[in-house]
């Protein structure tokens, strides 16, 4: 009886933690830019909307920290990454 309870407990714990893991995905091109804008500024784009043309994107500015490490495209387009990695570039 104790074995059955232990097995059920282990299955329950495994099931509840496996759904919380974020899946790494590839973010390239426009998808990368739109995802970064959403993560960093809360901006969401409509594909046909030109409202944000000419908007200055501070995330594209060079900083010492960004120059020292690989670019975001290297980290998240060539190799899958999570949104936690993406948000580290904000």
UniProtKB/Swiss-Prot annotation:
One of its GO terms (molecular function) is hormone activity. It comes from the Eukaryota. The keyword Secreted applies. Residues 1-19 form the signal peptide. One of its GO terms (cellular component) is extracellular space. It is found in: Secreted. Disulfide bonds join 28-77, 40-90, 76-81. Belongs to the insulin family. This is Bombyxin G-1. The gene is BBXG1.
């Amino acid at each position: 009886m104790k074995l059955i309870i232990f097995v059920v407990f282990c299955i329950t714990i495994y099931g509840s933690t496996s759904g919380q893991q974020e899946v790494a995905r590839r973010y390239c091109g426009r998808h990368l830019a739109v995802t970064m804008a959403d993560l960093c500024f809360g901006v969401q784009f409509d594909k046909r909307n030109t409202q944000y043309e000419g908007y200055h994107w501070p995330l594209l500015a060079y900083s010492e920290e960004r120059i020292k490490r690989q670019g975001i495209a290297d980290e998240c387009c060539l190799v899958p990454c999570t949104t936690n990695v993406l948000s580290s570039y904000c």
